[in-house]
């Protein structure tokens, strides 16, 4: 657990307020808008996730941000679902969250660490991310389906 000025970051899923995270992703995010709850839950189970809290997780904390990393634990990691609730922005909390993710001991060996962003390039550049070569990455985008 990491603590700073009344805020905390935890990777313990027992601390996460899944309702807050899901509502933000489902209702507010541009990248996961409309994600079904069961797929959201499945994604948490298979990721290294970081919850950002005001207060002490497990006691009096409120979930105010989140990020998760999808990784094979050896060569590749993908940072995704990063957010800080609007009323907590402008306090350096997103920077601290990303700093914590990048410094996590389980994420030090991956050669490739990627992400996608529409509007936070400056934040991620502080930690070494650079735009990918044009045309290098490809993807398939499908509509959400229920998990089986």
Residue ranges, per PLM feature:
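Short amphipathic alpha-helix that is part of the acyltransferase structural core
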Residues: 1-35, 135, 148
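A conserved beta-strand-loop-helix scaffold within acyl/acetyltransferase catalytic domains
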Residues: 38-83
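Conserved active-site alpha-helix within GNAT-family acetyltransferase domains
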Residues: 95, 107-143
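Short loop segments at secondary-structure junctions
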Residues: 55-58, 87-88, 141-144
């Amino acid at each position: 657990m990491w603590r700073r000025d009344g805020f905390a970051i935890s990777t313990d899923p027992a601390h996460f307020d899944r309702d807050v995270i899901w509502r933000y992703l489902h209702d507010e995010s541009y990248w996961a808008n409309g994600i079904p709850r069961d797929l959201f839950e499945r994604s948490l189970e298979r990721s290294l996730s970081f919850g950002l809290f005001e207060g002490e997780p497990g006691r009096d904390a409120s979930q105010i941000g989140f990020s998760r990393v999808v990784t094979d634990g050896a060569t590749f990691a993908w940072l995704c679902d990063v957010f800080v609730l609007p009323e907590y922005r402008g306090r350096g909390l997103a920077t601290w969250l990303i700093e914590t993710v990048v410094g996590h001991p389980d994420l030090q060996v991956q050669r490739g660490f990627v992400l996608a962003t529409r509007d936070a390039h400056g934040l991620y550049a502080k930690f070494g991310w650079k735009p990918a070569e044009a045309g290098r990455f490809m993807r398939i985008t499908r509509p959400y389906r229920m998990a089986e």
